[in-house]
């Protein structure tokens, strides 16, 4: 007798469908909070599976990168070409506390800057802030016509490009190493570093459209909860409740 499965017995009833489980029923929504340096604090929402067994929901949320337009963060449509990256560092209840992770330009903005008859000057440098963040900053600039210039082209010589690039290195290093990450991010929005480069390069060759087009965090210091809360405006100096100086312990009663 052949040993094997009985095909007649193994067949189940036809028409029985498996119970469909909605995957969203096992997930929770979390609010993403931006640092206090931005005008809008509620960035959006994100999903995560509920904590189950050894799997913690917080572990799946920490380290997530969120990309937001600066126009949405500061309610300024003129800054829509800047993209800000935020990293989730801590979870408090249903709130995800984020920190700055990077900045970049949109591709359409970069393409609109590149034109004919001018020289493109680029530079990048690694800098370290006072609070221990190692960043790589990318600067970009374009030559423009001198006052009362008749010639259509504004090409700079290679020696002039090297001099301008050297100025870019010096200014980006100086501006970044003398402040912490929070102050550096605040310099990106009004383009304070770009204006400094434009002013310094005026004696070499006049520039236009000078920007720090990209900032990338290469290395972060050890995570500090108090600094993150300070960045979100939730920290307090008082760690406990104060007790009155003239406090006296009650006397021990002999009988109750």
Curated annotation (Swiss-Prot):
It is found in: Cytoplasm. InterPro entries: Ribosomal_eS1 (IPR001593), Ribosomal_eS1_CS (IPR018281), Ribosomal_eS1_euk (IPR027500). Signal peptide: none annotated. SMART domains: Ribosomal_S3Ae. GO terms for molecular function: structural constituent of ribosome. It comes from the Eukaryota. One of its GO terms (biological process) is translation. The keyword Cytoplasm applies. It holds the Pfam family Ribosomal_S3Ae. Keywords: Acetylation, Cytoplasm, Ribonucleoprotein, Ribosomal protein. GO terms for cellular component: cytosolic small ribosomal subunit. The modification N-acetylalanine is found at residue 2. Belongs to the eukaryotic ribosomal protein eS1 family. Component of the small ribosomal subunit. Mature ribosomes consist of a small (40S) and a large (60S) subunit. The 40S subunit contains about 33 different proteins and 1 molecule of RNA (18S). The 60S subunit contains about 49 different proteins and 3 molecules of RNA (25S, 5.8S and 5S). PANTHER family: 40S RIBOSOMAL PROTEIN S3A. This is Small ribosomal subunit protein eS1. The lineage of its organism: Eukaryota, Fungi, Dikarya, Basidiomycota, Agaricomycotina. The gene is RPS1.
